[in-house]
């Protein structure tokens, strides 16, 4: 089940400040801690890293050029003379000083912030390497444009020597470019993988803190966050991969724009200005369309997750569905979820087709523009043939850079939807119970005390629509055994939830031992995905020898389990291989191993026969544990001293066991 609240809010999603703030909140912690004014420091560090990479790229270019000239003087003089002259001119200018100062400042600031950066040194190093490789790839593209300019001029002049020399240069560039581009792609994927691991663990830390996983349960009618499992598994992966891909593409576009615009401007100023206007038009149209695409993509992510959840729900309840012969209704419900997702995807296809129509026309028309403008210059003899071909290459590169948003608006819209889903999820985990707290003004006060007592306790449902128990006062002495009875829906299980701190909506006081001294046993015990050993020691990570585990199993009449399932360290789907009665007995084995001061049981023996029930309660009595049971069976009276009866009108009565027997006789 998913909430209807969040999809309505999705219609307001835009490329706005909220989207930017959510992006920073998710992206920043991997590289720099969140905090007041720290975002400015983080963005400043990114800018400084970029400047430092530019400085490193400059010195590498100087070293390779001058070193190459020293080793191959004839080659560099004949074929790379303009490059050598350009480098020599730069060395005589202010550029070397600026590059050196930038590196010194970067090193100083990194030293000053070493406390926050040292544990993040790997990610900053990988990001710096990525930026440097991006500069290198862009430089390779610029070099190739010049090589083909000279190759085409040699062809036009019928100069075979120059042609073969520059073709040899091109081959050398390709030999160097292939491993560089491969390393660039590998580094990008590696950083995305490390980032995904860290960010997923970061979300999991928040998800399991403050019982967020319980408050944000998709089965709860009070949640505003649908399918948190998808947000942690899929949206985080998409965020890290797409963030790096898109931001590096933006950087590449900026570098391409700077590099090839300079080339294009020297060929034709009119071509350059016209290109800028054309790209601005395309970007504006793409942004307008992208606003609608954000909502559609957001809804699609949610609806696909709903469909998947429906299938998982069928798998988890297959036996119950089979007993009820509910296949037809289940298929109908799953089919309805599929139909809703298909309808939204159909709308997505329509918008994608409209955008494709614009993008195709936009891209195909641009192919003739450089020819229309540069051809007259070539026919008039104002430019050579190589320049003509270079103009076409430069025009295409600049247009691609300027049209990044236009050509990738569908991916950007999907990315924005993912940011909003993760951002809303992240914000809710700061206070997962906030929506419930807004609906009421009072909370149950819980304090740690040696024994359990309730004082004027009133328990409401989380949505405050119903009062379950009102003004309940009860003292449970160390020798007491309390049985809670009442009609279905009158609040028996809810009372245990309030004692456990899961439900806080209400009034009054609860005094109880520390939660680690209490063990709660639900009617359907939780079977984790693990070994038999892990099942027995759950929820604690305690070391117990096999003999102790075997003894605990024998006490609850499950002594055959280790031999039946290959020992204590094999993994099985325990929910499937054990009956509910066996699961309940295994839960009592956990009680024996953990030795809690209080055992709180919610119909914990409902699937057991009378004999096994007697064995388990006698075991609890031998442990001298205080226990509270919720149940309906008259046989439970034998093991309890007091009975708390809850009534549908939120009233209650406390009886001794004998008085309650007489009442129901």
Feature roles, as predicted:
Residues 525-572:
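Conserved "ABC signature" C-loop
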Residues 303-307, 322-326, 332, 369-370, ...:
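Cytosolic ends of transmembrane helices, especially the final helix of ABC transmembrane type-1 domains
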Residues 132, 176, 180-182, 248-290, ...:
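A hydrophobic transmembrane-helix motif
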Residues 292, 296-347, 437:
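Loop segments that connect adjacent transmembrane helices in multi-pass transporters
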Residues 482, 493-502:
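Short, conserved post-Walker A segment of ABC-type ATPase nucleotide-binding domains
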Residues 76, 80-84, 220, 224, ...:
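Primarily ABC-family ATPase nucleotide-binding module
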Residues 1-170, 184, 188, 214-242, ...:
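Membrane-integrated ABC transporters
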Residues 498, 535, 569-665:
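ABC-family ATPase nucleotide-binding domain "signature/switch" substructure
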């Amino acid at each position: 089940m998913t909430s209807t609240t969040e999809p309505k809010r999705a219609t307001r999603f835009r490329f706005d400040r909220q989207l930017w703030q959510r992006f920073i909140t998710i992206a920043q912690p991997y590289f720099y801690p969140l905090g007041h004014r720290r975002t400015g420091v983080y963005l400043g560090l990114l800018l400084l890293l970029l400047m430092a990479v530019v400085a490193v790229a400059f010195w590498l270019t100087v070293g390779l050029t001058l070193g190459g000239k020293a080793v191959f003087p004839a080659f560099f003089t004949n074929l790379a003379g303009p490059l050598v002259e350009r480098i020599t001119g730069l060395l005589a200018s202010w550029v070397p000083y600026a590059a050196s100062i930038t590196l010194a400042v970067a090193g100083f600031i990194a030293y000053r912030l070493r406390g926050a950066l040292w544990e993040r040194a790997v990610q900053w190093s990988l990001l710096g390497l990525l930026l440097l490789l991006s500069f290198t790839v862009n430089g390779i593209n610029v070099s190739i444009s010049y090589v083909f300019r000279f190759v085409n001029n040699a062809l036009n002049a019928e100069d075979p020597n120059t042609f073969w020399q520059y073709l040899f240069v091109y081959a050398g560039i390709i030999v160097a470019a292939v491993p560089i581009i491969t390393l660039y792609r590998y580094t990008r994927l590696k950083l995305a993988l490390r980032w995904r691991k860290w960010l997923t663990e970061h979300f999991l830390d928040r998800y399991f803190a403050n019982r967020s996983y319980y408050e944000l349960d998709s089965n709860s009618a009070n949640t505003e966050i649908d399918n948190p499992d998808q947000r942690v598994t899929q949206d985080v992966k998409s965020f890290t991969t797409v963030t790096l891909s898109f931001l590096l593409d933006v950087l590449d576009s900026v570098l391409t724009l700077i590099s090839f615009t300079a080339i294009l401007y020297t060929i034709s100023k009119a071509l350059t200005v016209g290109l800028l206007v054309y790209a601005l038009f395309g970007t504006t149209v793409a942004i307008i369309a992208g606003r609608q695409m954000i909502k559609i993509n957001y809804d699609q992510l949610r609806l696909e997750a709903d469909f998947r959840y429906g299938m998982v729900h069928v798998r988890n309840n297959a036996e119950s569905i089979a007993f009820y012969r509910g296949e037809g209704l289940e298929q109908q419900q799953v089919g309805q979820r599929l139909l809703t997702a298909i309808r939204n995807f159909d709308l997505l296809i329509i918008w994608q087709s409209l955008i494709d129509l614009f993008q195709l026309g936009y891209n195909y028309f641009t192919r003739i523009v450089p020819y229309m403008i540069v051809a007259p210059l070539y026919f008039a003899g104002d430019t050579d043939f190589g320049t003509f071909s270079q103009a076409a290459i430069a025009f295409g590169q600049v247009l691609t850079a300027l049209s990044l948003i236009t050509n990738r608006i569908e991916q950007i819209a999907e990315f924005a939807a993912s940011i909003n889903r993760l951002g809303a999820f992240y914000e809710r985990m700061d206070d997962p119970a906030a929506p419930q707290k807004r609906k009421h003004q009072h909370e149950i006060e819980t304090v740690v005390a040696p024994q359990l007592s309730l004082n004027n306790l009133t328990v409401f449902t989380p949505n405050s629509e119903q009062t379950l128990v009102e003004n309940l006062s009860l003292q449970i002495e160390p020798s007491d055994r309390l049985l809670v009875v009442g009609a279905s829906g009158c609040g028996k299980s809810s009372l245990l939830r309030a004692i456990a701190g899961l439900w806080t909506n209400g009034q009054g006081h609860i005094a109880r031992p520390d939660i680690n001294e209490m063990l709660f046993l639900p009617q359907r015990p939780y079977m984790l995905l693990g070994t038999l050993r892990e099942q027995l020691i759950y929820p604690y990570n305690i070391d117990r020898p096999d003999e102790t585990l075997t003894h605990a199993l024998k006490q609850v009449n499950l002594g055959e389990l280790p031999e039946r399932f290959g020992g204590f360290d094999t993994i099985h789907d325990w929910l499937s291989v054990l009956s509910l009665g066996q699961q309940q007995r295994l839960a009592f084995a956990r009680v024996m191993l953990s030795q809690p001061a209080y055992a709180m049981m919610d119909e914990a023996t409902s699937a057991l026969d009378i004999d096994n029930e007697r064995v388990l309660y006698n075991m609890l009595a031998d442990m001298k544990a205080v226990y509270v049971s919720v149940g309906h069976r008259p046989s439970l009276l034998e093991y309890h001293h007091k009975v708390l009866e809850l009534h549908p009108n939120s009233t209650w009565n406390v009886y001794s066991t004998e008085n309650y027997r007489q009442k129901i006789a």
